[in-house]
Structures are given as C-alpha cells and as structure tokens.
C-alpha cells in the first residue's frame, strides 16, 4: 500500500497546460467530472457527463477537447491534487481484506466513476487471437459495458480484432483509444469498431495492460460517455487503481487454488511418493515397515482425495499439485 501512495504522490507533479479558447470553455462547463477540485457532487458530475457530452462518434471530431485543454478553465488547487491521493487511499482501504473479485470491481468502478469513467472491463490477456476471455465470479462477468455493445461485439467478432489488444500484448503502457484510432496500422474495419462503440456511449477510453505474479496478464479498460481525452495525471491514477485491482484478484485466485489442493496425511504423502518412484505396495510396506494392506489403504485414500481411479494417475497429480516432489 505505501508503494502505491508514493506513486500517487509522484503523479501529482504534473501541471495542466495553459488555457485554450473556443470550445474548451463551453466544454468545461458541461463535462468537468474529471476534476475533484471542482464540483464534489458525484451526481452533478454524472449529470453533466450524460447531458453535456453527446458527441455522435469518434471519427472526424473537430470540437473534441482534452483534460489538458480544460486546465486553464478549471483552477486545479493543491487541495484538489490532495483529493486525488485521498480517493486512491480510500480505495486501497476499502479493498483491504475483500476476497470477492466482483466486490473489488464494484469498488474500482466507484473510484473510476469520479474520473468520469462510467464503463469498465477487465479480463485475462490471452496469447492467442482471442482477445478477452470474460472473467466470471459468482456467475457475473467483470465488466459493465452496455448490453447492446457486448452483444454487438460478439456478433461482429470485435473481441478478436480490437487493436488495443494487439498493442497490449506488446507490453506497452496505458493506451489511449484515440491514439489507436489514428494509428496508421489500424484498419478501417478496426476503426469501425471504435465508431460503433461511440454510438453505444463509449466515446473515449484507455486500456491498461496489467502484469501480475506467475506471469498473469490482463487488461483493464476505462471508457467515458464524453468524447474527451484523458489527462496524463488521470491515466496515472487509473493505472495505479487497475494494477492494485489486478494484484488483488490474482492473490485471491492463488489462495483459492491453494485451498482446493487436498490435504494428505504424512503417511499418504509418503506412500504416494514411493508410488511415483515406481515401488509396489509390497515394496512400500517393507520400506515403511507397515503391512501391504495398510499401504493400499493409504493409497486408496490418496486416490479418493485426488479424484483419480489409478494409483499412477494419483502420483502424477500429486506431483503437479506440488504435494510431493521427486
């Protein structure tokens, strides 16, 4: 937790650029949910986000504004910067001890919502061309994208061609969707995916590649209803929160895996170890100075606990689970 706090403090060193004229001022009045130093009411922020940012699609936007362009319109005080740290610290405190991924996702969603991000999606990053295998916990998916957009993705196969997925596999940092849209390597079909996402309300977003223990790889996407670029500072905080979430989920998965490993007695471990070394029940009995029947009794218990029908398979499974070592 202290490491994340230090990273959060370093993220505050960024200072917004000067004011821009024109549409930036009017946009600031309608879509300021990204700055906690302004209106602290989440409900009012969301109202502006929903009512004030009704851009039709990503392509060809001449009036799009960024967090940087709003820097001159909104006075981001030191107290406001401190509030970012407070909110991140609150997220870390609230997630401490939580053992349900869906609950962790709900807490992360509430945190991201304060940055104007209504939509989130998390899932493992596979090595093949299947982009995002939806993670399920208690029969619920760890994403809150609109149902219509999820159905459209499945219908069109967008989950397998998303350019942010390809970029994430390269080990890049946070990816702005707008950058991928304008990238020369992005095809028209892939741009169409972004255009259609905007029609369903996902008008701007970022995707964060995540790395965890034992090589676990995942991605987390944050999307806004408002067509406005993400400030570098905002991305830094969302990346910290997403990384914390991923590490917590990975830890829970590891704990669950450990809990599912059957507990064998010392005698059972010793018997199955000798089975793995090719010894018969009679041989094991001589080595352990117990009867052959007692050896068979222990081996049958091992087979039952490991859910196998053969002693050889039981030995192999015991090795793979780390119960015994040759």
Curated annotation (Swiss-Prot):
One of its GO terms (molecular function) is DNA binding. It comes from the Bacteria. Keywords: DNA-binding, Plasmid, Transcription, Transcription regulation. SUPFAM superfamilies: C-terminal effector domain of the bipartite response regulators, Pheromone-binding domain of LuxR-like quorum-sensing transcription factors. Residues 257-322 form the HTH luxR-type domain. Belongs to the autoinducer-regulated transcriptional regulatory protein family. This is Putative HTH-type transcriptional regulator y4qH.
């Amino acid at each position: 937790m202290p490491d994340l706090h230090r990273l959060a403090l370093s993220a505050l060193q960024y200072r917004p650029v000067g004011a821009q004229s024109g549409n930036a001022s009017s946009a600031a009045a309608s879509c300021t949910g990204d700055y906690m130093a302004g209106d602290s009411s989440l409900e009012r922020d969301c109202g502006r986000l929903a009512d004030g940012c009704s851009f039709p699609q990503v392509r060809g936007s001449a009036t799009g504004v960024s967090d940087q362009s709003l820097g001159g319109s909104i006075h981001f005080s030191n107290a406001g910067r401190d509030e970012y740290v407070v909110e991140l610290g609150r997220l870390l405190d609230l997630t401490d001890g939580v053992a349900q991924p869906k609950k962790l996702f709900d807490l992360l969603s509430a945190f991201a919502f304060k940055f104007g991000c209504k939509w989130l999606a998390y899932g493992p990053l596979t090595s093949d061309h299947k982009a995002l295998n939806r993670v399920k916990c208690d029969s619920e998916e760890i994403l809150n994208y609109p149902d219509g957009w999820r159905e459209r993705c499945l219908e069109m196969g967008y989950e397998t061609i998303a350019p942010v997925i390809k970029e994430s596999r390269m080990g890049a940092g946070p990816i702005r969707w707008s950058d991928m849209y304008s990238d020369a390597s992005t095809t028209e079909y892939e741009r169409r995916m972004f255009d259609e996402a905007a029609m369903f309300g996902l008008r701007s977003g970022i995707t964060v590649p995540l790395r965890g223990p034992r090589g676990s790889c995942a991605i987390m996407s944050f999307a806004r209803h408002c067509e406005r670029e993400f400030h570098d500072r905002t991305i830094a905080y969302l990346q910290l929160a997403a990384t914390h979430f991923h590490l917590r989920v990975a830890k829970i998965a590891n704990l669950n895996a450990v809990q599912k490993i059957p507990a064998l007695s010392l005698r059972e471990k010793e018997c199955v170890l000798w089975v793995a070394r090719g010894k018969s029940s009679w041989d094991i009995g001589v080595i352990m100075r117990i009867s052959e029947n007692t050896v068979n009794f222990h081996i049958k218990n091992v087979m039952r606990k490991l859910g196998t029908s053969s002693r050889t398979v039981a030995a192999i499974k015991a090795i793979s689970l780390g119960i015994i070592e040759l």
